[in-house]
């Protein structure tokens, strides 16, 4: 929590996606942090973040490796955004 409000970190390489999610979530009263890629998400990760929303397909560090690194230090839930729908992608998401 940050300033008494739930805090959500959104990592997506598409600015439009980040902006839409940020506006929707801030409108519901959440504090929203954003990151352009997995590397930035890892750098922004903190105990005050209550939920991570990570795009699976990002340059530099993609969502799955970013989630694994974040998970080493923090226990907040992680939601993945993806256009992928294969069984292996679903399994990978649950294994992080």
Question: Where in this protein do the model-derived segments appear?
Answer:
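Acidic, metal-coordinating helix/loop segments flanking the phosphotransfer/catalytic sites
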Residues: 34-51
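Acidic catalytic/metal-coordinating carboxylates
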Residues: 37, 62-65, 70, 89
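Two-component/phosphorelay signaling modules centered on CheY-like receiver
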Residues: 15-33
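A short, hydrophobic beta-strand element within the central beta-sheet of small alpha/beta folds
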Residues: 75-85
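Active-site residues of response regulator receiver
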Residues: 12, 55, 82
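Non-catalytic signal-transmission and effector/linker regions of two-component phosphorelay proteins
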Residues: 1-9
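Receiver (REC) domain active-site loop signature in two-component systems and cognate sites
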Residues: 58
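Conserved phosphotransfer cores of two-component systems
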Residues: 45-48, 69-76, 96
